[in-house]
Amino acid sequence: MSPAPPPSRGRIRPWLVVGDLVVAAMWVCAGALVKLAVYGVLGLGGRPEADAVKVALSLVYMFFFAWLEGFTGGASYNPLTVLAGALASRAGPSLYLFAAFVRMPAQVFGSILGVKLIRAALPKVGKGAPLSVGVHHGALAEGLATFMVVIVSVTLKKKEMKGFFMKTWISSIWKMTFHLLSSDITGGVMNPASAFAWAYARGDHTTFDHLLVYWLAPLQATLLGVWVVTLLTKPKKIEEEADESKTKKE
């Protein structure tokens, strides 16, 4: 079964709030289950093949969530994805406000609910990966990783690639690359909702370190990434109009 075609851009779709909440809860549960399978069930902690198995399992559920996003018409587990989409669509302040003040809080609440459920069912999943470096080092790492991921994600959307497999494959491999590179520093989260949910479970969700590293840095990186892609990728209509006006002048 193929994903449903994406809805037209720039529309406020209230039903996505429920979809965001459910998908965000499912996402944190999926990530926790993969870690539990790799380090608990398979006992690969500290072994070189642990990362390979983790990547393979993660790619499977990343494809599932990409399909789920298309099937639901845009439900997402990551506030940065919603924010980047609203900014890149140029649909005006209403869509941006809907994303920032309705959809993103729903994703945060869904992530918290997911963490509570998975920890109640499987206490061995732990409380997530806390920041293991200084706050400024962590903010730089999380911001840079987010910036690189946003650039590729927004570019793929603007190019409107028709192949679901290839588009998802490129995006997933790119995300996993930067997740692995930053996993020993910040956990490689690149998802404020998920990071907040695990921090809430640990009780450090209101600290300055958490807000700077997992919220301010990735949000700024998202804004910068969307701006860079928008600057470098000129819409075809604008290019055609510029060519036509140039031809008329000649």
Curated annotation (Swiss-Prot):
InterPro entries: Aquaporin-like (IPR023271), MIP (IPR000425), SIP2-1-like (IPR044226). Expressed in leaves and anthers, and at lower levels in roots. The keyword Amino-acid biosynthesis does not apply. A motif (NPA 2) lies at residues 191-193. It is found in: Membrane. Belongs to the MIP/aquaporin (TC 1.A.8) family. SIP (TC 1.A.8.10) subfamily. This is Aquaporin SIP2-1. It comes from Oryza sativa subsp. japonica (Rice). The lineage of its organism: Eukaryota, Viridiplantae, Streptophyta, Embryophyta, Tracheophyta. The gene is SIP2-1.
